Amino acid sequence: MLDTKFDELMEFPASFPFKVVGDASDTLQDRVVAVVQGLAPGDYAPSTKASSKGTYYSVTIRVTVTSKEQIEKLYTQLAELEGVKRVL
């Protein structure tokens, strides 16, 4: 598990943005939403932007999180998605 200090810095529940950067893929946004739905079910409206050369996509999604552990699980599972380079 990650060693973060989210519990010291935040009050829960909280709205928390995740930005997932990965290889350009038409399915990246759907895969990000599927991971988020598995840990924090809700109605999400993520935004996707292509890099200047179109090589990468970034998907930004705002999630209502309820604990430090939930944030850590989201970071871990999003980072494990195929083609993902970074989770910010």
Curated annotation (Swiss-Prot):
Record SUPFAM superfamilies: YbeD/HP0495-like
Cysteine pairs bridged by disulfides in the record: none
One Pfam family of this chain: DUF493
Gene3D superfamilies: 3.30.70.260
This protein's GO CC annotations: cytosol
Family statement: Belongs to the UPF0250 family.
NCBIfam families given in the database record: PRK04998.1
HAMAP family assigned: UPF0250 (MF_00659)
Protein name in the entry: UPF0250 protein swp_3927
Organism of derivation: Shewanella piezotolerans (strain WP3 / JCM 13877)
